[in-house]
Regions:
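PRPP-associated nucleotide enzymes
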Residues: 14-186
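Single conserved hydrophobic/aromatic residue that forms the stacking wall/gate
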Residues: 1-12
């Protein structure tokens, strides 16, 4: 029996699934809205406005999940009726949204709506077609950073191919002393 492309993809998918199951820092989000948004974004017949709307929905869901471990602070606020004890994102931390140019920009507007206190730090790389290695051409990440343990970074890049650009982006922040546990790829 000859093997078709479907068999190759199936084997590769099973292998990738095993690798993903071994990762304890990988979160796969599955729900109907995520699936519908991905379907809309991938459909060649979707117009630009449709892609943007689907990306906004997807960004919101992904960031809600990605930010659930941000440090919080207990505060007391005054409501129209009484005082109320609650929690808020710790104002002593620095949140960075770091889109990898250009594809990562599609997540930026929604990310800033969700995290208005975040700073945007663009990073730009392209893939050398011969070596498949990333080549830097733009970096707006400050050097050095004070109190790197108080930084929380969300790297946005929907166009994952080899993963080398994402690895380089993570390395950029780790080299500044930011703990890997404080870096999330969306």
């Amino acid at each position: 029996r000859s093997r078709g492309l479907g068999d190759v993809y199936k084997r590769q998918s099973i292998k990738e699934e095993r690798v993903m199951m071994e990762q304890n820092n990988l979160k796969i989000i599955t729900n109907p809205i995520v699936n519908q948004s991905l379907c809309t974004m991938r459909n060649k017949n979707t117009d630009t406005e449709g892609v943007r709307l689907a990306a906004r929905k997807l960004t919101r869901i992904l960031l809600y999940e990605a930010t659930k471990n941000l440090p919080q602070k207990d505060i007391e606020i005054e409501t129209p009726l009484t005082k109320f004890k609650t929690k808020t994102i710790n104002p002593d931390i620095t949140i960075i949204i770091s889109p990898i140019l250009r594809a990562g920009l599609i997540f930026t507007d929604e990310a800033v709506d969700i995290l208005p206190q975040a700073t945007i730090r663009h990073i730009g790389m392209y893939r050398d077609e011969k070596t498949l290695k990333p080549v830097w051409y733009y970096n707006k990440v400050p050097m050095p950073v004070d109190n790197p343990e108080n930084y929380y970074v969300y790297i946005t890049d929907p166009m994952l191919a080899t993963g080398n650009s994402l690895i380089e982006a993570i390395r950029l922040y780790v080299d500044k002393g930011i703990p890997e546990t404080n870096i999330c790829c969306v």
